[in-house]
Amino acid sequence: MPRYKLLIEYDGTPFCGWQYQDNGPSVQGALEDAVAALAGTHVRVHGAGRTDAGVHALGQVAHIDLEKSYRTDQVRDALNAHLRPHPIGVLSAEIVPETFESRFSAVKRHYIYRISNRRANLALDLHRAWRIARTLDVAAMHEAAQVLVGRHDFTTFRDTECQAKSPEKTLDQLDVTREGDAVSIVTSARSFLHSQVRSMVGSLVWVGHGRWTIADMRNALAARDRTACGPVAPPEGLYLVRVDY
């Protein structure tokens, strides 16, 4: 039974998230329907990251096990055909060893959060970025972000319904940069807690507006208390960029 690794991009706007749910369409559900159309039977699609409702992906990775062997280009093209009109694209398919697990074999996940720091309404970036009209102090945001880099207890920055056994994570990167009106927050780690990235972004925006100092960020992290967190950034600016193996 060959195992295929899929590289996937999607617009998360119309979906209730990656994971299959009863209350609305999911990316996983759409992919499983497409795989079933190819294979003639239900096949579970295992993803590397369980993105929330409205979150996008440029490089989500999944794996599937098929009873029949297909050429990798056949798998890619068939899935793309059956996925229409969903805003999901299968960029590539490759055969991998049975020991490969899209979620558990991953060694690092990379995300970017996009902010459009302008007064004008969003047109082309509608549902693709968080528009913030008030000018952000990106230098202060980047300095505050470095407080969070390293191994910490991120209880403050995780959802109260997060099911991870431990709140400790090692954050490898958290950089804030600006190019014109575009503010980018780039982060990477082996894994993240539920809502961790958006919670960090929302708190960094408070720093960018002068509502928080760098000391406030340090105190929030040390509090290990969800109520000490700043606002949670909306999902539309977040993208899963790449998963490393």
UniProtKB/Swiss-Prot annotation:
Reaction it catalyzes: uridine(38/39/40) in tRNA = pseudouridine(38/39/40) in tRNA
Residues annotated for substrate binding in this entry: Y111
Coiled-coil region: none
Superkingdom of this protein's organism: Bacteria
Keywords for the protein's UniProt record, in alphabetical order: Isomerase, tRNA processing
GO molecular function: RNA binding; tRNA pseudouridine(38-40) synthase activity
InterPro entries listed in its UniProt record: PsdUridine_synth_cat_dom_sf (IPR020103), PsdUridine_synth_TruA (IPR001406), PsdUridine_synth_TruA_a/b_dom (IPR020097), PsdUridine_synth_TruA_C (IPR020095), TruA/RsuA/RluB/E/F_N (IPR020094)
GO biological process: tRNA pseudouridine synthesis
Family matches, as Pfam families: PseudoU_synth_1 (PF01416)
Active site, UniProt feature: D52
Enzyme Commission number(s): 5.4.99.12
SUPFAM superfamilies, per the entry: Pseudouridine synthase
Enzyme class: isomerase
Keyword tRNA processing: yes
Subunit text: Homodimer.
Family from the record: Belongs to the tRNA pseudouridine synthase TruA family.
Cross-referenced NCBIfam families: hisT_truA
Function: Formation of pseudouridine at positions 38, 39 and 40 in the anticodon stem and loop of transfer RNAs.
Protein name in the entry: tRNA pseudouridine synthase A
